[in-house]
Amino acid sequence: MRIGILPLVVKEVEKNVLKAVKEHVEEFYSRFGFKVETLPPETVSDIFFSYNPIRGQFLGRFFLMKVAEHREGFSAVLGVTDGDLYEEGMNFIFGLANPYLKAAIISLARLRPEFYNEKDGEVLKERAIKEAMHELGHVFGLAHCKNPICVMHFSNSIIDTDYKGKNYCERCLNRLKRNLEGRE
């Protein structure tokens, strides 16, 4: 069983962030028999039509569909982009997932400390790990959790992301174990 991590590059997806995400996902999901690999980066030139110049953002579902194109041979594929994403009815999204597509995408744009005039560069890695674990949880059948420190708690703002942990609470972990039992 494999999880792929696909960099979808608008300008730059930092290698150190990809490495941190890969290491954490691998450390956690290896207990279920998953191997994690980083795929070669891809540009978004073929889905640039999803860019809304008025908002300065990309429509996230097209990024998700591009990630899903790489799912063959993988149990899940996680896209990581530097593009600022949104969905209709929302100002922005940190990420998006679809369990039927076995695909998820996270956006680093609003996870960056400089977006909030913060200085701590290491916080980007922590935030990216949390959002990656959250979206992979959705891919593997988890819903949002009411526990504010569970990684599956919905992040309405960066404050929520910073507050929650980077792992699943006991309830979500048990549900994840059941969902992954017998998976090949």
What residues fall within each predicted segment?
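The catalytic-center signature of Zn2+-dependent metalloproteases
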Residues: 114-184
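Generic structural signal for residues positioned in beta-strands
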Residues: 2-4, 77-79, 104-105, 150-151, ...
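Fold-level signature of zinc-dependent metallopeptidase catalytic domains
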Residues: 1-14
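Short, histidine-centered active-site or binding-site loop motifs used for metal coordination
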Residues: 7-9, 110-112, 156
